[in-house]
Amino acid sequence: MSNFAKIFQSNWIDLNKLGKLEIFLKTILGIYKAPNRTHLLAHAADISSFYAVKNIYEYMKNDDEGKEILKNKPLLIRQDIQFNELKKLPKNTLGYKYMEFLETYKLHAHDREVAHFFDNINYSYILTRYRQIHDIGHVVYNLNISIESEAALKMIELIHTKLPITLLAILVAPFMSPLYRFQYIFKDKIPPNFLNPNFDYTYXDDYNYIDELSLKQYVYNLTEYFHIDKINNNLFFQKLYKYYFDNLNNSNHIRGTIIYGYNNENNNDIIFDDINNEYIFLKNPEKNYFLFKYKPRQTLLNQLYPWAYMAGMAAKKPLHSIHIENWLDKDIDIFRKTYNIIPLPDHLNLMSGIN
């Protein structure tokens, strides 16, 4: 018996159509109230995806590589993959990049929900595999886990899978994406009083840039992602972590991100920001941090979605029908070239790429 056969037997939930409809409506309501509860999204996808998954199955059983995947049902789990060995691979291999992504964002393939509501083991496997391969999509397309990056990947997945839940994500994401995002990038370490209400976010320098904003005009929230490897103060870390989860999906406020360990190699204090078509003040020597300002919603609609549509159409095969497991020790650029995968453009890398 394959590993997935055991997983299928222990996770299958037998429900009639009325029961599935009830769960679907409850999960949609739950997603609206708490978008970060990903298992609700998974349940909604289970129930709404029957015809899309059936079409994926028909495609895979008529494709040599897809047929092999359906027969062996490989999984990105510890029983099938030696994850620690992937860390020892050369740095430009798909497996190394995959592990680097998972560890950067504190993720694991085991976290992906198994499909519960399919009677057919092949259908259940296809949706489960799609969820596990999702992180591979982040890696090969070079997308981080911000709302707008997730939405761009959903656009690619919609083209490849036709899953209704991907369309829902694409439609909802612009309303969840913040209008502005401020990134404070600290050269040395985050000041201990950064979250203190009295911390001065304003600029007292001679330089100004178009539409300069004092952050005191807004409720400043920390969201998206941050690195904590240089923080020794546990109390500060706990406070930062709480801010992160409290505001993870709150798009009613201006939202910010902390990253640090960045060195300014630009000789000029004023640079032209091609993303937002404006001049920005880059360096603040006195406070020892740099500021970048993005417009995620605008970038998602005007740049990320068009690129994602083009990338989705250009790919030779959807990721779920590629035997990814055989590529983990291969060069990621060769993988991209083989399947004509177009990664995120360089000019969007700082905002939406894996950093």
Swiss-Prot record:
A Pfam family that the UniProt record links to this protein: Coq4
Cofactor(s) demanded: Zn(2+)
Enzyme type, top EC level: lyase
Functional pathway: Cofactor biosynthesis; ubiquinone biosynthesis
Gene Ontology, cellular component aspect: extrinsic component of mitochondrial inner membrane
InterPro entries for the chain: Coq4, Coq4_euk
Topology versus the membrane: Peripheral membrane protein
Catalytic activity: a 4-hydroxy-3-methoxy-5-(all-trans-polyprenyl)benzoate + H(+) = a 2-methoxy-6-(all-trans-polyprenyl)phenol + CO2
Protein location: Mitochondrion inner membrane
E.C. designation(s): 4.1.1.130
Keyword line: Lyase, Membrane, Metal-binding, Mitochondrion, Mitochondrion inner membrane, Ubiquinone biosynthesis, Zinc
UniProt GO BP: ubiquinone biosynthetic process
Membrane keyword on record: yes
Protein residues bound to Zn(2+): 134-135, 138, 150
Subunit structure, interactors included: Component of a multi-subunit COQ enzyme complex.
Comment field (misc): This protein may be expected to contain an N-terminal transit peptide but none has been predicted.
Reported function: Lyase that catalyzes the C1-decarboxylation of 4-hydroxy-3-methoxy-5-(all-trans-polyprenyl)benzoic acid into 2-methoxy-6-(all-trans-polyprenyl)phenol during ubiquinone biosynthesis.
PANTHER family: UBIQUINONE BIOSYNTHESIS PROTEIN (PTHR12922), UBIQUINONE BIOSYNTHESIS PROTEIN COQ4 HOMOLOG, MITOCHONDRIAL (PTHR12922:SF7)
Similarity comment: Belongs to the COQ4 family.
Protein name (record): Ubiquinone biosynthesis protein COQ4 homolog, mitochondrial
Organism whose genome encodes this protein: Plasmodium yoelii yoelii
Lineage: Eukaryota, Sar, Alveolata, Apicomplexa, Aconoidasida
